[in-house]
């Protein structure tokens, strides 16, 4: 949906867009999310545990592998390997504040790691760590209505500490506002089909500037999803289109999406996102 998910409820993936999105989740969920982007290869594992009276909790581990690099000696021979990775441990809690309003919070431990194997005397391993918080909320205009507003602030208060140089660099804070609306007119023309449209505005400040995102999701019998979206321009990349497909059978749900255009495609690697979720 063009990453316009701040007002959506996509399950465990929504933790990274808006932690409030899991507040009304009914089923426990175990999920694996995989991505291949210009930044690297990402893998996330999440477990979601809803309760009847105390809201919903989740635990997540997200690893971004930026890519192995060779260490060479003065003769150009490979003597070691550098493995830079970004690692995030996240604990999430979300709950209903009223019958219309939900809120959620992520508490994250962030590590920027550079591990090394072999001869690493000229490079050295390094771990920079920090803690940060994401907060979010979602609001239904009327209880049970098809219009939902969402807001989230990500990476609040985080500064990366370097053990080697004692530098403190702020994490890229993002502010996102958006809405999602179910278009009911399609009910008169197609049975068992729902159409939702979403849009959001993001301000990444010095990290990427401002951008907009739009998307649609067509759902058939609650089991087949066809998605399309648009990711607006910011300072890090140009505009891009997005297409996605989702399938659900019993407790298993599979989703795949791809974006086209912008910086990643121009460098020859269009981003691909794959999710496998088990609801029980």
Protein language model features and the residues they cover:
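Subset of outer-membrane beta-barrel
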Residues: 1-280
């Amino acid at each position: 949906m063009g990453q316009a998910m701040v007002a959506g409820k996509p399950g465990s993936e929504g933790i990274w867009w808006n932690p409030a999105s899991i507040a009304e989740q009914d089923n426990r969920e175990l999920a694996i999310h995989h991505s291949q982007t210009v930044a690297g290869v990402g893998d996330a594992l999440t477990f979601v545990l809803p309760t009847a009276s105390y809201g919903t909790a989740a635990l997540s581990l997200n690893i971004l592998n930026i890519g192995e690099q060779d260490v060479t000696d003065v003769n150009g021979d490979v003597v070691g390997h550098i493995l830079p990775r970004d690692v995030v441990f996240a604990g999430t809690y979300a709950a209903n504040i009223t019958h219309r309003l939900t809120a959620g919070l992520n508490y994250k431990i962030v590590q920027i790691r550079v591990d090394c194997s072999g001869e690493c005397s000229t490079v050295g391993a390094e771990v920079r760590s920090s803690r940060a918080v994401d907060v979010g909320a979602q609001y239904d205009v009327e209880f049970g209505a098809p219009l939902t507003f969402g807001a989230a602030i990500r990476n609040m208060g985080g500064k990366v500490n370097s053990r080697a140089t004692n530098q403190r660099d702020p994490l890229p804070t993002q502010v996102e506002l958006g809405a999602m609306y179910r278009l009911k007119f399609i009910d008169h023309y197609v049975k068992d089909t729902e159409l939702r449209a979403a849009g959001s505005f993001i301000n990444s400040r010095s990290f990427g500037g401002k951008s907009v995102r739009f998307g649609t999701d067509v759902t058939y019998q609650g089991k087949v999803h066809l998605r399309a979206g648009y990711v607006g321009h910011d300072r890090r990349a140009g505009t891009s289109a997005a297409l996605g497909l989702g399938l659900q059978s019993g407790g298993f749900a599979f989703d795949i999406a791809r974006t086209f255009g912008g910086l990643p495609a121009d460098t020859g690697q269009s981003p691909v996102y794959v999710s496998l979720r088990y609801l029980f």
